[in-house]
Amino acid sequence: MKRVPWAGIILLLGLAPLALGGYPLRLAGEAVAWAMGATSLAFLYRTTGLVSLGHAAFFGGGAYVAALLTRGDPSYYFLALPLALFWGITSAVALGWLGLRSHGIYFLMLTLAFAQLIYVLAKQGFPGITGGDDGLTGIPRPPGLEGQAAYYLTGLGLLLGVLALYRAFLASPLGLVLDALRLNERRLEALGWDVRHYKLLAFALSGALAALGGVWLAGQRGFVHPHDLAWTTSGQLLVMAVVGGIRPVYAGALGAVVLIFLEATLSAYTNLWNLFLGIFLMIAALLRLRRGKGAEHAPSGA
């Protein structure tokens, strides 16, 4: 059987918006940023089995860091990017240090509460800094990337680099340990491994990637809004990861592209686009559930 040339297919799909230009190219640029955020959640689930509703704090927080530092001078992106990553890592470590003591629904609710805390602080706590309900506008792009095509291509290259590192990480000794942790945490603990330490590491890496996506979204749109920090944004990122299959390396990217372009297409034809989008998500969830059950009952190979 011939191997499918996935690299060539991905390259062609990635370059297609350049030929279309205009609105499709802007949508593609936005999809790249959301893909990074969705990939951060897919990575967390793939390596630890954890599900978070707090990633909007990292995603939107990265966007706000970029906005606050670059509104006056785009050359400050050299400082905004590492500080946004620092925000993603430190806030994830703080949340993980508290949250990883709990499991299941308790962990999920704690992450949601954290995101809402950051959301309220940005919206009402420091309106003179964050812009309050109005957010912040006039965010420039990095020098040399002012054009949409250049910004999109750079973001696409960054996303592909992230996915390549993600794939390499899974095959590394550390990635194999995390995979074993996801499959049987108690057995790993019984063998003397500090599983909480490894979970915290995965959570920190996930937070950094989400913050990177937020930085890229701020430059793409030119504004940030408190909604970027709300738990609904976490839910949107999670839905993207699930639509893409959540376990494959490309899950977050695929889900982001599908939802961004599907939403844009439906909203262009009907005011009821949310209804049709919801129906699509229900069908996607049912298909995933059926596929999962089929995999459970499939006979194992010799």
Regions found by a protein language model. Name each.
Residues 28, 52, 65, 92, ...:
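Generic structural signal for small/hydrophobic residues in well-ordered secondary structure
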Residues 17-71, 98-107, 187-189, 245-249, ...:
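Single transmembrane alpha-helix segments in multi-pass membrane proteins
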Residues 81, 92, 203-291:
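Transmembrane alpha-helical segments in multi-pass inner-membrane proteins
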Residues 73-116, 254-256:
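Alpha-helical transmembrane segments within multi-pass membrane transporters and channels
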Residues 1-36, 65, 73-80, 149, ...:
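Membrane-interfacial amphipathic/re-entrant helices at transmembrane-helix boundaries
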Residues 114-145, 175, 270, 291-297:
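Extracellular/periplasmic helix-loop junction at the C-terminal end of a transmembrane helix
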